[in-house]
Amino acid sequence: MSTDSFPQQYARTQRLTLGEPRNITVSDDGCKVVFLRSNAGDDPVNRLWLLDVESGHETMVADPLVMLGADDAEDLPPEERARRERLREGAGGITSYSTDAHSARFVCTLSGRLFVGDLHQVNVREIRTVGPVFDPRLSPDGRWVAYVSGRSLRVVSVDGDDEHGSELAGPTLFDEPDTVSWGSAEFVAAEEMNRYRGFWWSPNSRHVAVCRVDEAPVAVWHIADPAHPERPANAVRYPAAGTDDAVVSLHVFDAVE
């Protein structure tokens, strides 16, 4: 029996949230449920699980310790780190995932790497990509994955037969300045409106609606780290109250030829 005080237990279990099901997805036929859960109330590493509704049997579908290796520490892209900070996400492992319309396949990221899995056969494999991956989303038909990498939105086949996929929208593709990004939510949307994504698949998987964000009007702030005065200050665009916000527009692209 644990002799920890309540404050110690509350901290160790991350406010009594570890070990409970979260990010729940019910299949369209109601036969299975996909969810995230760690192995115990003091385990911070989330795994992906599949529940068969009729039998009540649970199957672990994806284990980060197997996918990355038990000795590999998480190396999060800046976008994923910011998302977790906004959501007060203290757990590790798989903290988000996406499924197709029938919950037959899923995609997730670990340390900026893209993984796709089959929920029927329970296998997981990595898809090679260009740069770190953020916010991957499966197309409704389960054939394609759209994801953000840097300031661009890319699309890749789940079969991995199109080497690294293709860039669907990005400042390099359109010869735009480095204040422009595609596929990510702007600061105000993510921080104040609880909208953390910047692109959406069409129901027929043929098109993607993508946010274009231009931060050129946003004021630049310089933030220094008092603990490391030898390091230069970071330049950050921050839309303080009463100042200009980013310019945001929505565009629709054909996802595949």
Tell me the role of every PLM-derived stretch.
Residues 1-257:
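Beta-propeller folds
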